[in-house]
Amino acid sequence: ADTIVAVELDTYPNTDIGDPNYPHIGIDIKSIRSKKIAKWNMQDGKVATAHIIYNSVGKRLSAVVSYPNADSATVSYDVDLDNVLPEWVRVGLSATTGLYKETNTILSWSFTSKLKSNSTAETNALHFTFNQFTKDQKDLILQGDATTDSDGNLQLTRVSSDGTPQGNSVGRALFYAPVHIWESSAVVASFDATFTFLIKSPDSDPADGITFFISNMDSTIPSGSGGRLLGLFPDAN
C-alpha cells in the first residue's frame, strides 16, 4: 500500500469513520481516520486559501484554511515525518465526490521544500508555483478524473461542460519531480505549501473534499478510494 501523509479539507461528515458531524480540516497519517481535526466553516462558492507548513526541528505539521474577512480554521499535529515517509516522495492534491457532489477547483498551487545539511552547507531546495494551469500541463501527473480547463484552473473532479459538478468522481494531480523530503544528515528539513480553491455545490450537503498529500513516488489512486476515502486510501482502517 502507499504511504500517505495528508491534510484533508473534508466537506462531508462520514461519522462512521470517525468524522465529526460538520465540515472539518484534519491531518491524516497513513489512514483516513484523522489524527487531529478542527471545525471548518466551509463557504460555498467562495475562493479560499490553504496553507500547510512543516519543520523538522519542531516536528509539527500545521494547516490553516481561510476565506477573506472570515475566521480561519487551524489544525496542527506533532509528527516526525522521517519515521513515516520515504526519503523521496511526491506531493499532490486529491479530491472526490460521491452521491453528493461539489466542484473541487484549484486556482493556484505553490510548494517549497528545503533541506539544510549543516551550518556551512547550502540549502537544497525545490520550489514550484502554478498561478494558473495550462491545457497541457507537462509538469503535473494527472490521475483519475483530474483535468485542466480552458479558464486556467485545475479541476480535480469531473465537471460537465456548463461547470456542474458530477458525482462519484475521483482525481489527483502530483508534481512531476520527486521531492527530497528528509535526509539523515539534514539539520533542518522543512516545507510549505499553499493552494487556493473553490468548492461550489448544487447540493445541500457538498461532498467529499480536497486534500494536499505527500506519498511514495509511484503512488496511484487506490482501487475503491472514492467518496469518503478522498482518493488516498483503499479502506477506512
Swiss-Prot record:
Belongs to the leguminous lectin family. Homotetramer; dimer of dimers. Mn(2+) binds at E8, D10, D19, H24. Binds one manganese (or other transition metal) ion and one calcium ion. The metal ions are essential for the saccharide-binding and cell-agglutinating activities. Concanavalin A-like lectins of the Diocleinae subtribe undergo proteolytic processing referred to as circular permutation. The propeptide is split into an N-terminal and a C-terminal part, the gamma and beta chain, respectively. These are then religated in beta-gamma order to form the mature alpha chain. The beta and gamma chains can often be detected in cell extracts. Residues 1-118 of the mature chain, as displayed here, probably constitute the beta chain in the propeptide, residues 119-237 the gamma chain. Gene3D superfamilies: 2.60.120.200. PANTHER family: CONCANAVALIN A-LIKE LECTIN FAMILY PROTEIN (PTHR32401), LEGUME LECTIN DOMAIN-CONTAINING PROTEIN (PTHR32401:SF47). Lectin. Induces paw edema in mice. Has a weak vasorelaxant effect on rat aorta. Has anti-inflammatory and anti-nociceptive effects. This is Lectin ConGF. Ca(2+) binds at D10, Y12, N14, D19. InterPro entries: ConA-like_dom_sf (IPR013320), Lectin_LegA_CS (IPR000985), Lectin_legB_Mn/Ca_BS (IPR019825), Legume_lectin_dom (IPR001220), Leguminous_Lectin (IPR050258). Keywords: Calcium, Lectin, Manganese, Mannose-binding, Metal-binding. A carbohydrate binds at N14, L99, Y100, D208, R228.
